[in-house]
Swiss-Prot record:
Residues 290-541 form the Glutamine amidotransferase type-1 domain. Homotetramer. Keywords: ATP-binding, Glutamine amidotransferase, Ligase, Magnesium, Metal-binding, Nucleotide-binding, Pyrimidine biosynthesis. The lineage of its organism: Bacteria, Pseudomonadati, Pseudomonadota, Gammaproteobacteria, Pseudomonadales. This is CTP synthase. The gene is pyrG.
Amino acid sequence: MTRYIFVTGGVVSSLGKGIASASLAAILEARGLKVTMLKLDPYINVDPGTMSPFQHGEVFVTHDGAETDLDLGHYERFIRTTMTQNNNFTTGRIYEHVLRKERRGDYLGATIQVIPHITDEIKRRIIKGAGDADVALVEIGGTVGDIESQPFLEAIRQLRVEVGSKRAMLMHLTLVPYIATAGETKTKPTQHSVKELRSIGLQPDVLICRSDHPVDASSRRKIALFTNVEERAVISLEDVDTIYKIPGVLHAQGLDDFVVERFGLQCNSADLSEWDKVVDAKLNPEQEVTIAMVGKYMELLDAYKSLIEAMSHAGITNRTKVNLRYIDSEDIENQGTSLLEGADAILVPGGFGLRGVEGKITAVQYARENKVPYLGICLGMQVAVIEFARNVMGWKDANSTEFDRNSGHPVVGLITEWADATGAVETRTEASDLGGTMRLGAQDCQIVAGSKVHDCYGKDVITERHRHRYEVNNNLLPQLMDAGLVVSGRSEDGALVEVVESKDHPWFVACQFHPEFTSTPRDGHPLFSGFVKAALAQKNKA
């Protein structure tokens, strides 16, 4: 039977619940247990698919096409389990489902209330998401005390009672600030945070004390005394120079032993040798490259969380320190390509909307004309095609219909029909809703032998995740190819362009899919690894 570890946060947000949860999950997995993770988001949006990257950060796409919270990216990078649409849900999704059942008459005329109807639906989804895992870690978004999270906290209170203390425990992350002028850590915020939890019937079993300084033994004893938590379960988690150290930090303090004993599980001791290798490669690089990343959302780098991590993973696999130079594409529009000078490679990620697109196109032109290694992702592929059409074909009005519906050469247009992951045909028009209407999830792609992308993957067919509603216009594709645009990857049915390359360029690859969603610190990703190798070759050539 599945054991549940519910994870909450207190005092302030952004303490790193997702990282801490994933790190514990990684240790339990290293002990031979089957582990899964869930993220419960209290906001009322149905999913984050239409939320601004400046507010929410990245939208992580699962294998089965769910648009989810970026924490699911952390989960997949730390454990081997593949997340699905069952691993993330929001208040909006819960209410949508309950109200649909009410409209159908499923509740037989009952008055619909938060308790029991909303809480029952939350519990049902937690159990479904946990599946047949030995241990399921369930992270509750937000901070204890927020009004939005109250139904979720009530639901886990009920579930703890229903499954019993041998199958459920609560891990609470809290801030233990260090006051430099006084030279001491303060435990009072933690005490009050636990008091808030206990007022709604939740007693923590584990406390993770986040701080920028070590939380000493006397402070941990004091916290244990005032919060009714075992002293061995009060864990100090200070800031580290790489998040991939955290499994080792938690293991060294015996957190996994406490969990295993509490649940009465029989399992092996943890083998964290893979994580030791990752940390060693990360902290002891043998080479160094600088890559210019030209994006639209540079004010909030969480909008590119998986991509930034994927570049770090590529550095790990190549024993190379990857310095990312973050450049706002609008700055290129205003200041020119001098911002790109000195970069060993150029990376243009995805995005939506007209703002900053011309700066991205200029960055592509700089990379192509100056033979600088280039990797384009999603919109990064579309702007590569637009740049080629304008500056090689001479179609100065070439554009995407996303940005100019009246373009005389719409080389990129809305996908109106495609087959989803199950083979069902989906259709869209300009009038379709924005939410949940993109080409989403894992799709097979046929790779052309002898291409740069084939050199990276070493396969004829690959599977990568997508999140887009625009594609290369097949009506203009023959002319583009005649002029030298190389199409090195197509969808399984051959209908959609997935990868393009530039002839007579040392390394120019642009893909419609999002390879960053499947990159992990232990295995890296072949495309990003190849990109960093190309950047190293460029640097050594200079």
